[in-house]
């Protein structure tokens, strides 16, 4: 299944690239998916006619029904297995080559009124993957003449100490016959891979959420910088499940006085069940200031009670020497 590069499939993309249809004709009362009538038929949008078209045309049977499956964007090499499944959907390691994936299904038959000339199969597509995005900001607003924060790297991996350890599935099987939000859309998930989400130099200026674009040394513009991944549960409630960490590297450069740069690496385990058709935004905050605090009511330790030292008294601590002059 091919897809748009690093960006989601919206209606405009659907019109431009088209979608694929599988259709199985049956006289049985039960739903039977397959490709006896439509076998990965490409459907495209004709802007001049303002309608969806395909060729060669097929025609409604007078009885029975047709069970339809559809997906987008269209790929001429897509084939069905087990009646309704697409095997080995692969998630590219190259973010700009990743593929958003839509699917839908429906059962249709001609109406009882055979004089009708408008029998449309209405499709409503759903997103089959999880979408991840990110923003970055500072913990506060700091004077640039004093300090500069430079984002260097963002990695998603399966370990906080080994950024090469995989986390996300690399492939899986999608069943186009499944309904939306049931949770059984995917099977045979396999592989683990990490993502180098950002590598470069992006100056984070303030506490407003932002995203590096190409003009300011970003790898990709925000609209192209989504991850599309097979749904996966990283909740790790028992400590034995799949693990996901976001690892962020950034420089703090002190500009006043002797210019000094300190490299920082921070990480956080993301305990989340990434679900199909859901978009997630990782909002990253960097630059934890060193602040000082003294309690104005008790921040200075008192002297306590004076320790008495009695000298020259009658308690066995007489003067060491006595000198008298007349």
Annotated model-derived regions:
Residues 1-326:
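Sec-type signal peptide cleavage vicinity
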């Amino acid at each position: 299944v091919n897809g748009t590069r690093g960006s989601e499939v919206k209606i405009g993309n659907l019109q431009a690239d088209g979608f694929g249809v599988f259709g199985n004709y049956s006289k049985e009362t039960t739903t039977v998916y397959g490709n006896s009538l439509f076998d990965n038929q490409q459907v495209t949008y004709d802007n001049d006619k303002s309608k969806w078209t395909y060729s060669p045309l097929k025609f409604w049977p007078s009885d029975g029904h047709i069970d339809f499956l559809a997906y987008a964007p269209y790929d001429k090499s897509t084939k069905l297995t087990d009646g309704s499944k697409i095997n080995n959907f692969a998630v590219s390691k190259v973010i700009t080559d990743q593929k958003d994936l839509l699917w839908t299904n429906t059962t249709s038959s001609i109406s009882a009124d055979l004089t009708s000339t408008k029998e449309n199969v209405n499709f409503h597509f759903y997103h089959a993957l999880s979408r991840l995005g990110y923003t970055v900001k500072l913990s506060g607003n700091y004077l640039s003449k004093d300090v500069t924060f430079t984002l260097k790297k963002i990695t998603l991996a399966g370990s906080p100490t080994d950024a090469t350890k995989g986390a996300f599935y690399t492939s899986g099987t999608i069943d186009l016959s499944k309904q939306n939000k049931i949770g059984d859309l995917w099977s045979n998930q396999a592989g683990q891979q990490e993502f180098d989400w950002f590598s470069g130099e992006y100056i984070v200026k303030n506490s407003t959420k932002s995203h590096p674009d190409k003009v300011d040394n970003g790898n990709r513009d925000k609209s192209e910088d989504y991850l599309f991944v097979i749904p996966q549960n990283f909740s790790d409630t028992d400590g034995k499940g799949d693990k996901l960490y976001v690892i962020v590297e950034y420089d703090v450069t002190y500009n006043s006085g002797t210019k000094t740069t300190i490299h920082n690496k921070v990480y956080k385990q993301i305990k989340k069940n990434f679900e199909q058709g859901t978009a997630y935004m990782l909002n990253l905050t960097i630059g934890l200031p060193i602040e000082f605090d003294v309690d104005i009511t008790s921040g200075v330790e008192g002297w306590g009670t004076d320790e008495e030292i009695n000298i020259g008294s009658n308690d066995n601590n007489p003067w060491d020497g006595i000198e008298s002059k007349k």
